[in-house]
Amino acid sequence: MNSLAGLFITAVFVENLALTFFLGMCTFLAISKKIEVAFGMGIAVIVVQTLTVPINNLVYQYLLRDGALVWAGLAEIDLTFLGLVSYLGVIAAIVQILEMFLDRFMPALHSALGIYLPLIAVNCAILGGSLFMVERDYNFTESLVYGLGSGFGWALAIVALAGVRERLKYSDVPDGLQGLGITFISAGLMAMGFMAFSGIRL
C-alpha cells in the first residue's frame, strides 16, 4: 500500500509529465488561458490516462510481450513491435468515447475544449504514460495508480499555469513578452519549482 501511495506521489510531483518531462506542451500552453477550461481539460486527461494506462498494460501483458500468447498456444510469438500502434489505438478509442460523452452530457465543456479534445488522442503525455508503464514493467495495479497519478499531475500543472496566466492579465507585462512569451517564462519557473522534488525517492 505504501509503495502504491509513493508511486502516486512520484507520478504527481517528482515525475510530473508536463513540468519534468515536458510532455503534452501543445495542449498545456494552448488551453491554459482560463482556469475553468484548464480544469475541464485536466479532468479529461485524468480520465483518459486512468483508463488507457491499465488497459494498455493488459494489452502488453496478454498480447504483445514476448511469450504473452502462451495462453493461445503461441508462446514463441513476440508482438512488441506493434506496441506503439496498439497503444495509440486504445488511446484514440477512449478519447472518442469521452468526446461523445461530453458532447451529449456537457456540451459547454465540449465546445470550450474545441479541437484540443480530439488532440488528446495524439497528446504525447498520454502516450508517454503508457510507454513509461511498459519501460518500468508495472503490474496492473501499479499501472492504474500510475495512470491516475500522472493524469492528476498533468491536470495540476495546467490548472496552476492557468491561474498564473489569469493573474498576469492584470500585470504590466512588457510588450515583447505578452502572450506566449511570458507563458513560456512562467512554465519554466514552475518547472524549476518542481525540480525541488527531483531528489525524492518514495
Curated annotation (Swiss-Prot):
Keywords for this protein: Cell inner membrane, Cell membrane, Ion transport, Membrane, NAD, Sodium, Sodium transport, Translocase, Transmembrane, Transmembrane helix, Transport, Ubiquinone
Location, primary (coarse class): membrane
PANTHER family from the UniProt entry: INTEGRAL MEMBRANE PROTEIN OF SOXR-REDUCING COMPLEX, NA(+)-TRANSLOCATING NADH-QUINONE REDUCTASE SUBUNIT E
Subunit: Composed of six subunits; NqrA, NqrB, NqrC, NqrD, NqrE and NqrF.
Keyword Membrane recorded: yes
Record-annotated membrane-spanning stretches: 4-24, 35-55, 81-101, 114-134, 144-164, 180-200
Protein name (record): Na(+)-translocating NADH-quinone reductase subunit E
GO molecular function, one term: oxidoreductase activity, acting on NAD(P)H, quinone or similar compound as acceptor
Location of this chain's protein in the cell: Cell inner membrane
GO CC annotations on file: Gram-negative-bacterium-type cell wall; plasma membrane
Domain of life: Bacteria
Record field: catalytic activity: a ubiquinone + n Na(+)(in) + NADH + H(+) = a ubiquinol + n Na(+)(out) + NAD(+)
Protein family: Belongs to the NqrDE/RnfAE family.
Function: NQR complex catalyzes the reduction of ubiquinone-1 to ubiquinol by two successive reactions, coupled with the transport of Na(+) ions from the cytoplasm to the periplasm. NqrA to NqrE are probably involved in the second step, the conversion of ubisemiquinone to ubiquinol.
Listed EC numbers: 7.2.1.1
Organism: Nitrosomonas europaea (strain ATCC 19718 / CIP 103999 / KCTC 2705 / NBRC 14298)
Key word Cell inner membrane present: yes
